[in-house]
């Protein structure tokens, strides 16, 4: 027996060569079914017992502070608190969460960790079922962060680290009939923490299930299931390797395959152990092998995830079933062929996302229900793949991916991003075993899942000898799947696929201080390198941090154009915000530094496509549209015909309806629907109208298409929209201005302070006052009521986006970041001066000209020339010319802002929507007549920034204001400066007034990454002169 004092003295958690002690060898998940029927039906096993629930808990400052008697079976823990298992103790009122992206939250001195090492001790009393006593009983911890020692009934059992894979211990010789006691000492930091630097919250504790498993003394120890298909992918076979817990000739393994309705597909086939010769020394007597032919099996894919069920039973010499296991089986073949990744002979297009396991209240302790929400959202938004960034996921995740149809890149729990260089530990021989176990144990646990199509060696650990060893072992252990790894350049000998991060479509990414070094080539260029025949799949791309995902569609144009560009995985799925309550009792989502964690990387954990509660970011719609499985094009001719191309590889569209409409100036003038039948990888031409609708001068015409489900699916209900398209139809342009209504000019008067323009306004008296000192409309009366709180002013500023700020680490600011350039120029501090103002009465209007200069420290940066044309109907046409200093960096926006009284009326507009969109993110936002509440016009990004824009607007109604022209629209109750200064949504101050921002031009948001200027050139405002016009009026 190992004494407690010896354990403390040994400090296994600071020895990289001690990764485990007395841990059971890794294997596929086991359930210990008592019969074949129970295994077939997947009944709850009587030989499994979850130990989740309330445990006794105490947190100590360091392992040395733990009293040695707390491991005793009779220790009185009544003064301790209860804690929920599974959970992270930082979210149960102990210690504090820490977020870092790259740097370690402690001194980088591997394998040593801080002396102040929070240590949680868990205790649980449980009762062993009487029927279990003469069996082999193990306890399985599915996830404990970061390392732990285990005692049973006061006796030390073993030690484990690796937070994301199971640790199983044999308790058979420690258990007693009736009551038993477990004690677990969990350390926050261990040498394993150096391998788990994965751009997420550092959280601790028993955060996955704890389970007791009882097996016969001689039982099934492991099972490997694989499938094969013939060269034509018509007929197949299932291969099953069954391993015994010890060598014996007294048993037979029996295997039978059942279909999705649990009807038998094959006969029951038995095989003895030790039948096949392994080498010249003979067979393995603990191994039985089956290869069973399966004619014309249903094949598994993300589109049609058909699952069989294989039941494996251990039968003794008397014909009695002593142990049974069962697994879901998908018939599919993954291969690399002709420079492409293929499944069942078809080249895949990966519509992928990186996904952290995260819950805003439970941290890393996620439930089946939480996982199911993610699965359905992924399917609904046209994702077909997920990368388990950057660690093996909860075992249930893979079952759901098997069932619902998602391709999985299963990634080892390995990242050393904070090392200098990153490969420091990857070449240190003393760390080899730690690396290898993280790979080998993942493969052994997850090998039977059809959804897993690629193994990954980990993330951002440089490239070292250990990676080559991991790669070679994996290829030999499982030749049925490719292996990928980005480290060392994304195209090394340790990867079967080129898997770069954040490589651009057409532009090489160079190092600032080494312009001749090309660490990331443009993805199109990469394919053309000499002797390069591998496919390219971006393991991370399109950094979705806040208001992002600009120019995302360009990646998808390239993916569809180049067959060896086979998609990628967006970074990432969910904002890793944690729920916190402020002093006013309001909830908000916290990020790095919000818990007093001094070493942190602020909001860099907030880069998901969905909020922590899984409500959607606007960027999701863009991803869904770009990734959709149907493409549309208009067919030339007199009839309204559309060509539909199906990107489904395996299934015909049998459960979908095509709904279409034609709009004139946003109003539907024709519509229809038809059942959609398009075979996989084929096209179909449909005639929607026998002739084009008659056109009116000056109206815009659009064809709008939706593909909707006409029956329920496991992941969505009938009526759900899976694909959309909008096609601009020919229109007759308005060649001349629409003549104004015949009437006289409004009345003009002025004094030394103001210019006043008054008129009848279609029967309603109006009066405008323009302040001569400011050059701005100071009052706009209609029927005696003032309609504005502040008149239109130049607006060149936006509250900085994460992509504008440009940093991935809190202390590493990019001097080329947009916000740095704007701050240097003083854009946020421009001081406007009215240089000249004059007014004149024309035949039917009053013309007011104003000249502005915008200065920083008496230096003129921007001049703007405004011309108000005010007619007797109360309409104000605003023409603006803007001139920029040659030295000025591209501006974030050029337009105007005015302030209106608060209103509960919804905003109506004819333009892109209904969701937020920006000039480089408009693919999913169709032009139509939209209506949203004021609240819906605001996007509550966790780190507040510019938001809520709607592009390409022709006309809009905000409160009593009507606007027409060509502009982008944003409406908010928050000022731009408040948004810019706020760190969280609870810092936003509702001013109970409406800020109406009318942009003629707006810079793109970018999003190829978030730490360098990533807005594409065509979406930069880099001209020296701009002109725009719009018309304002009040009802």
Curated annotation (Swiss-Prot):
Instruction: Quote the record's binding site residues for Na(+).
Output: 199, 604, 607
Q: Pfam families, alphabetically?
A: Bgal_small_N (PF02929), Glyco_hydro_2 (PF00703), Glyco_hydro_2_C (PF02836), Glyco_hydro_2_N (PF02837), LacZ_4 (PF16353)
Q: Which cysteines are disulphide-bonded?
A: none
The UniProt site entry described as Transition state stabilizer is assigned to 356, 390
Q: What is this protein called?
A: Beta-galactosidase
Which InterPro entries does this chain map to? B-gal_small/dom_5 (IPR004199), Bact_Beta-galactosidase (IPR050347), Beta-gal/glucu_dom_sf (IPR036156), Gal_mutarotase_sf_dom (IPR011013), Galactose-bd-like_sf (IPR008979), GH-type_carb-bd (IPR014718), Glyco_hydro_2 (IPR006101), Glyco_hydro_2_AS (IPR023232)
Q: Which reaction(s) does its UniProt entry say it catalyses?
A: Hydrolysis of terminal non-reducing beta-D-galactose residues in beta-D-galactosides
Question: What are the record keywords, sorted?
Answer: Glycosidase, Hydrolase, Magnesium, Metal-binding, Sodium
Partners and quaternary state?
Homotetramer.
Task: Extract one GO cellular component term from the record.
Answer: beta-galactosidase complex
Record GO terms (molecular function): beta-galactosidase activity; carbohydrate binding; magnesium ion binding
Transmembrane spans: none
Keyword Magnesium listed: yes
What cofactors are annotated for this protein? Mg(2+); Na(+)
Residues annotated as binding Mg(2+) 2 are: 600
**What does the cofactor section's free text say about binding?**
Binds 2 magnesium ions per monomer.
Gene Ontology biological-process annotations = lactose catabolic process
Q: Mind telling me which Gene3D superfamilies this protein's record contains? A: 2.70.98.10, Galactose-binding domain-like (2.60.120.260), Glycosidases (3.20.20.80), Immunoglobulins (2.60.40.10)
Positions contributing to Mg(2+) 1 binding: 415, 417, 460
Amino acids binding substrate: 101, 199, 460, 540-543, 607, 1011
